[in-house]
């Protein structure tokens, strides 16, 4: 049935429609094509860019205006205007916030139902305690704080530490399952570097891992190791093929978290490359370098620490502005969610 043949609310008698509303019901057909459009989703997510040079001063001012005791986490949320600023979504299922912690501050121990990660943007001396292990937070590091796992933050260095929070909060909130619980101070019961030492070399596992599968065995992915792996992978990747590595569970090869996927991209000097068009939405964060991105018909120049929203079903082309140095990007997407729901698609 074509859109033109669908009835409208105006076609219905006024008293009939008012009776439907009084009974907490509505007719589907007037809005059917809004919720089930032809061909592809009627996307509300816009390909917005948040420039770190614009957001950082406001984040630092938040540090002056609001003590951490009154904020729990001092965060500025990246809000996509297409989804409504008040909904605090960067895409339909992904939340992104930039969090500031100052020297000597701590964020109390807690756990929550949404899946979350921290990706460090700047600063030294920050740390996260997760599951009894103290994880240092250095620029570009990815720290997992899975659903229901205790974690707390602190800062033992100088100057501000800023990281990017990525959560599936819109999804969990949308199904009325979002909550958090405060806890007592964590006890350190693991030596520093335990999880990264256990899974340092690709293809090698602790022998005991052969008889068990841990949901979240690796909680910290150091950027220096990821960066080096990208360089080595680029050396054996033909020109014209995307240099992209996925963050995975080293025991199972599955994605790190149930609903969100994470990957790192290296754009070789002077490279322009098109990403696969997919059903999943995503977020790109610039770790090092500068360049430009075209999302459908929208073009943005980007530089270090900028963050960009990628709508579902979008055509994305990335370009490195440098002819001599690589550019590195961190990507968050909801492909794991799409796969579990049976709706994941890759388009030619």
Swiss-Prot record:
Regulation: Partially inhibited by Na(+), Ca(2+) or Mn(2+) at concentrations of 5 mM. Presence of 5 mM of Zn(2+), Hg(2+) or EDTA results in more than 95% inhibition.
Reaction equations catalysed: 2,5-dihydroxybenzoate + O2 = 3-maleylpyruvate + H(+)
Keyword flag Iron: yes
Cofactor or coenzyme needed: Fe(2+)
GO MF annotation list: gentisate 1,2-dioxygenase activity
Assembly, per entry: Homotetramer.
PANTHER family: 1,2-DIOXYGENASE PROTEIN-RELATED, CUPIN
UniProt protein name: Gentisate 1,2 dioxygenase 2
Source organism (scientific name): Aquipseudomonas alcaligenes
Gene: hbzE
């Amino acid at each position: 049935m074509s859109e033109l043949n669908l009835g409208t609310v105006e076609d219905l008698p006024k008293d009939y429609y008012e009776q439907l509303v009084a009974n907490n019901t509505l007719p589907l057909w007037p809005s059917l094509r809004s919720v089930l459009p032809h061909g592809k989703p009627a996307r509300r997510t816009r390909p917005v860019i948040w420039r770190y040079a614009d957001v950082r001063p406001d984040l630092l001012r938040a540090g002056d205006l609001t003590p951490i005791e009154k904020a729990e986490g001092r965060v500025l949320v990246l809000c996509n205007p297409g989804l409504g600023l008040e909904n605090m979504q960067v895409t339909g299922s992904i939340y992104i916030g930039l969090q500031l912690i100052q020297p000597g501050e701590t964020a109390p121990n807690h756990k929550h139902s949404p899946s979350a990660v921290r990706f460090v943007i700047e600063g030294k001396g920050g740390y996260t305690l997760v599951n009894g292990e103290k994880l240092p937070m250095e620029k570009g590091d990815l720290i997992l704080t899975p659903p229901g796992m205790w974690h707390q933050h602190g800062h033992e260095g100088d100057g501000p530490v800023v990281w990017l929070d990525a959560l599936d909060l819109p999804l969990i909130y949308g199904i009325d399952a979002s909550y958090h619980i405060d806890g007592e101070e964590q006890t350190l019961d693991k030596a520093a570097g335990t999880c990264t030492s256990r899974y340092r070399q690709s293809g090698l596992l602790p022998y005991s891992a052969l008889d068990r599968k841990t949901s979240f065995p690796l909680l910290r992915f150091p950027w220096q190791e990821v960066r080096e792996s990208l360089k080595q992978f680029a050396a054996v990747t033909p020109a014209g093929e995307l240099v992209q590595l996925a963050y995975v569970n080293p025991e199972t090869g599955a994605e790190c978290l149930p609903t969100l996927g994470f990957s790192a991209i290296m754009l070789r000097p002077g490279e322009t490359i098109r990403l696969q068009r997919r059903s999943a939405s995503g977020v790109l964060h610039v770790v090092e370098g500068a360049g430009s991105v075209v999302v459908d018909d929208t073009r943005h120049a980007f530089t270090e620490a900028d963050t960009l929203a990628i709508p579902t079903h979008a055509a994305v082309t990335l370009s490195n502005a440098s002819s001599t140095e690589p550019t590195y990007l961190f990507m968050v997407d909801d492909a794991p969610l799409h796969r579990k729901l049976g709706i994941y698609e890759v388009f030619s």
